[in-house]
Design a protein with these regions (language model features):
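Non-catalytic cap/lid and distal C-terminal segments of serine-dependent acyl enzymes
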Residues: 1-186
Length: 186
């Protein structure tokens, strides 16, 4: 990732920025061997990452580094389940973020009036508050197309990128990063 960022900054294709990478892979309560429903509690997987991000990580970064702390200068992106975490965190803290990057994210859009607090059913508000919304995915089978289909015609502004010949993998996500970053903080 650092090579991608260094090259983009060096080529003046993006503004210099601080990039923080944290793992939202905070485990869910483990099921017991032989549990008839081993996926019980899966909805809680990574749920405490929200608290870590908002209550601990962002304040520590702002205290430690010379940052611009307003929402216009803060973006969040995530890959796979982290894409869903990104949407949950940003849409519940829209006063802190204005850019969303979803790289093969498991948005699992079902009902725009209910998903993510219903903000996707209010396109005027969403588009006013979110300066850039990016959805990227691997073209050889990945999350993305179903979410894009759910958003089409909704009035939500978003860009998409299909990584050719890749699936749910790091090459997809590196390509997504390369496409997403030049659109930040403009």
């Amino acid at each position: 990732m650092h090579n991608i960022m260094d090259n983009l900054i060096g080529a003046k294709e993006c503004v210099p920025m601080i990039v923080v990478m944290e793992s939202g892979d905070i485990n869910r309560p483990a099921s017991k061997p032989g549990d008839p429903n081993p996926f019980a509690g899966f909805a809680d997987y990574g749920k405490t990452f929200y608290e870590v991000m908002i209550q601990d990580l962002i304040p520590m970064i702002d205290k430690t580094f010379r940052t611009k702390t307003d929402r216009d200068h803060r973006a969040m992106a995530g890959l796979s389940w982290g894409g869903r975490q990104t949407m949950e965190i940003v849409t519940n803290n829209i006063d802190k973020f204005s850019y969303i990057g979803d790289f093969s994210g498991a948005l699992l859009l079902q009902n725009l009036k209910e998903d993510f607090g219903g903000i996707l059913s209010r396109p005027d508000e969403f588009n006013r508050k979110i300066h850039y919304f990016f959805i990227g995915y691997g073209g050889a089978g990945d999350f993305g197309p179903s979410d894009i289909k759910a958003l089409e015609g909704s009035g939500i502004k978003f860009d998409t990128y299909e990584s050719p010949g890749t699936a749910h993998e790091f090459l997809t996500w590196r390509r997504c990063l390369r496409k997403f970053v030049p659109n930040l903080f403009k």
